[in-house]
Every structure is written in C-alpha cells, then in structure tokens.
C-alpha cells in the first residue's frame, strides 16, 4: 500500500454526489480487433499499461469531510465479460478496489471507468495504450514505429485541469455598483487544457 493520496477535484465531486445504483456514472469504451483476444497476453499488456499510467492505479476513499484517491499496489486483471455494461464500480462493498475494469469478449476489449477518475478522452488514451501494448506482445516487431499514446509527463497527467480556471473570491476585482447598473462581472478566464481530467 502506498502513502500517496490525491484530492478529488471539483468535477469528480459532482460525479460522486450524483452516482446512484441506477446511474453509477460509469462509462465504457471498447475496441474490436480482427482476432480473438488471448487472455494471458491481455493481462500482461494491462499490467504493463498500469505501470505507464500510475494515476489510474488508485482506490477511492471517504475522509471525514471529503473523498480522496489513494495510490494502491493492486494490479488490474482483465476478466471475461460477464456483467451488464457499465455496472457500478464504486459502491460500499467495492471501496478498496480499483475504480475501472477491463473485460473481453470474443475479439473485443472493453474498458469501463468511474467518471470521477477521468473523462472519455482520458479513458480513450488509456484503452489505446492497452491495445497498443497487447498488439505489440501478440505481433513482436510490427508496432515498433507506433508511438505510445501516453506522451504526457506524470505531472501533466495528474493535474487538475480546472485549477487554472478557478478564481478565489478575494481575487475577483469587484466594484461597487449602483442598483440601476445592470452589468455582470466575470473574472473567470476561459482556458483550454490538454490534461486527462475534464468533465
């Protein structure tokens, strides 16, 4: 067990607050190959990918006042698909488990993630890494020229991309206005970000 823990960003808090058994806030991305999935090779590729993306190797915990992510030494294991798509990933009985799952069926690899950990773009990049590592193991030498989808630094991958857009109350340049002045002050800059965490 690692000592590292991470704050849950504001967008993740929304998903935590609104997740229900009927709407568990889980999304699924899949990739269908031209060949049957080999489970042993997929698990080897998944372990390799998990080491490349340590920010997804976390469990979600409830603190006294807030939730937080804690790094874990657990390794993901790909399982045959045997549940309904997007089954809950964060429930009281799953508290100390990873909050994503990888399954396979026939020639398809499925990635399901709890939305508090990343958005669809982050999930897609993670699945691309799994598939690339899987195909590199299945067909040695054929993917040497294909770059890894994970080209960002560990710091870039772990950052809260909404933080630059957040303005503290004391930083807003409020001006005293009369009631007759009908105008709105907006001090939040609009920024773009290439990090994984978004909505």
Q: For each predicted feature, which ranges?
A:
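Soluble acyl-CoA-dependent acyltransferase catalytic core bearing the H(X)4D motif
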Residues: 24, 29-199
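N-terminal low-complexity, Ser/Thr- and acidic-residue-enriched intrinsically disordered segments
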Residues: 1-15, 19-22, 27-32
């Amino acid at each position: 067990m690692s000592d590292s823990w991470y704050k849950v960003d504001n967008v993740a808090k929304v998903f935590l607050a609104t997740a229900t058994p009927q709407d568990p806030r889980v999304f699924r991305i899949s990739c269908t190959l031209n060949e049957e999935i080999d489970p042993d090779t997929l698990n080897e590729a998944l372990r390799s990918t998990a080491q490349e993306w340590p920010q997804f190797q976390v469990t979600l915990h409830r603190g006294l006042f807030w939730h937080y992510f804690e790094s874990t030494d657990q390794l993901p294991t790909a399982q045959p698909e045997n549940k309904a798509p997007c089954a809950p990933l964060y429930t009281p009985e799953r508290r100390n488990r990873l909050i994503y799952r990888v399954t396979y069926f026939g020639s398809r690899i499925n990635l399901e993630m709890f939305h508090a950990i990343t958005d669809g773009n982050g999930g897609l990049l993670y699945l691309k890494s799994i598939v690339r590592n899987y195909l590199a193991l299945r067909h040695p030498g054929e993917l040497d020229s294909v770059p890894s989808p994970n080209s960002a630094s560990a710091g870039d991958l772990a950052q809260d991309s909404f933080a630059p857009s957040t303005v503290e109350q004391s930083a807003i340049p409020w001006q005293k206005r009369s009631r007759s002045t009908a105008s709105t002050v907006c001090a939040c800059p609009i920024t773009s970000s290439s990090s994984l965490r978004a909505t």
